[in-house]
Amino acid sequence: MTYLSRILEEKRQAVLALKQQRPLQHYLEQETELSPCRDFQGCLKRSVDRIKLIAEIKKASPSRGLIVSDFKPLEMARRYMDLGASAFSVLTEEVFFQGSPDYLKEVRRAFSLPVLRKDFILDECQIFESRLMGADAILLIVAALDPHQLQDYLDLARQTGLHVLVEVHDHRELDIALNAGSMIIGINNRDLRDFSVNLHTSIKLRPYIPEGIVSVSESGVKTAADAALLDNASFDAVLIGEGLHVSEDLKRVIWTET
């Protein structure tokens, strides 16, 4: 069983429990009270001379286990703000990444940057949940959805005001994302089947993302040279989590502030 299949199996059970606790009507009744989402897509559009940074707030991962033992999301977010982050990504998946919706809520309340909910979205109820949680954007993973689901969830998210980062790993998935009308494409350098990382996945796929669509490279950025490679490939933004926490090299990179 791959990492992805294990995660999705557990997530399906969690979604069933969520729907029993809070039927869809619960979310629909509260949706009218929400303030507008912050402009996640707009804040990622590349500056003339510098790639943008999405800084990820992550406690653990399936492959590494616990990454940050003394986990303080607000302090982490503040450090990333000082580095010049343009947006935050907050893990809310609880079993494999030890994330929490509370982390996202805390960060969203404390800072003015747009916040991406990083989780495995498999049902429309999670989209409404994300909006009520305070997320400005959600992640939709092509490998976790069929093309019809991707299209439906992309449309629904936009109707609620959410921005959507659509994640791909190969040419086939990129074609599916583009055909669905995705406006923010994230190329994951990590293969979710075995969690191996190859930064050149991004370099290979970047030329096939049309102008006008925001391009993001995700995972595997460990050094300033890695960031420069993606910058030179004309990515709009890069999403970095563990690297920002452990790499002194990356902490010295001067990112463009929003």
Curated annotation (Swiss-Prot):
It holds the Pfam family IGPS. It comes from the Bacteria. It catalyses: 1-(2-carboxyphenylamino)-1-deoxy-D-ribulose 5-phosphate + H(+) = (1S,2R)-1-C-(indol-3-yl)glycerol 3-phosphate + CO2 + H2O. Pathway: Amino-acid biosynthesis; L-tryptophan biosynthesis; L-tryptophan from chorismate: step 4/5. PROSITE patterns: IGPS. GO terms for molecular function: indole-3-glycerol-phosphate synthase activity; phosphoribosylanthranilate isomerase activity. It is an enzyme of class 4 (lyase). Keywords: Amino-acid biosynthesis, Aromatic amino acid biosynthesis, Decarboxylase, Lyase, Tryptophan biosynthesis. The keyword Lyase applies. InterPro entries: Aldolase_TIM, Indole-3-glycerol_P_synth, Indole-3-glycerol_P_synth_dom, Indole-3-GlycerolPSynthase_CS, RibuloseP-bd_barrel. PANTHER family: INDOLE-3-GLYCEROL-PHOSPHATE SYNTHASE (PTHR22854:SF2), TRYPTOPHAN BIOSYNTHESIS PROTEIN (PTHR22854). Belongs to the TrpC family. HAMAP family: IGPS_B. This is Indole-3-glycerol phosphate synthase.
